Amino acid sequence: ASNLQEWQDAMNMRSIISFNGIYADKEGNIFFIHNSSSPKRLEGLDWKEVVDGSRSKYIWNDYVALNEIPQILNPSSGWLASTNQDPFKVSAPSDNLKKENYSATLGLQTRMTNRAYRIKELFMENNKISEIDFDNFKFDNSYSKSSRSYKYVSTIFDKEFEEDKLIEGQKILKDWNLKTDLSNKSAALGVCVLSPEWLAEQEGIAPPDTEEVFRDCVYDLSLIHI
């Protein structure tokens, strides 16, 4: 494809059945599509549950048209960011699509990743972005205070501990600037505590008890540094 129309025509072939796409060209166009080859399903059913496959009206035979799946062209904010997140939170709030305008049968994800929160924060905090800024955004290694990870870690902040090591570990977490660069001495404990939550989310199970994870991390890291 050499222009936006050709790119959209290529996407309309539906050869790529998944994977979000963001397009940009020398003309200044930017375009987001929450790409999918989604079945055209009967409305009014919870398709996450078991559906009676013996009834013909529940059997789908076609795909939802490309223009019926979430997409944004040239938002006024001037930016788009897609990092495996809610397709209704890929630009500034004034430019985002409205969930109620799309069929619930699409089964669109609503999760937000830490990367999604961070890139949104970085774009929203900066009205003008240089090429250097853009590179820094790309390689940002911070956790967002809006992320599940931070909310999980922060449950440790108000707990009362008696052991000196746990009190010290709690202070390290409270003082952590949420960055994970090589020289960040707090990152080891922070990432150790939040990692089980991330793994649990990936597996679709409840996260483990934060205090137990914190205790294990503090003592495991203490042994490493003896």
Would you name each region that the model predicts?
Residues 12-15, 158:
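N-terminal cationic-hydrophobic initiation segments that often serve targeting/anchoring roles
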Residues 25-224:
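Long, compositionally biased non-active-site segments enriched in small/hydrophobic residues and glycine
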Residues 2-13, 119:
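Alpha/propeptide regions of enzymes that mature by internal proteolysis
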Residues 18:
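Segments that shape or occlude catalytic/ligand-binding pockets
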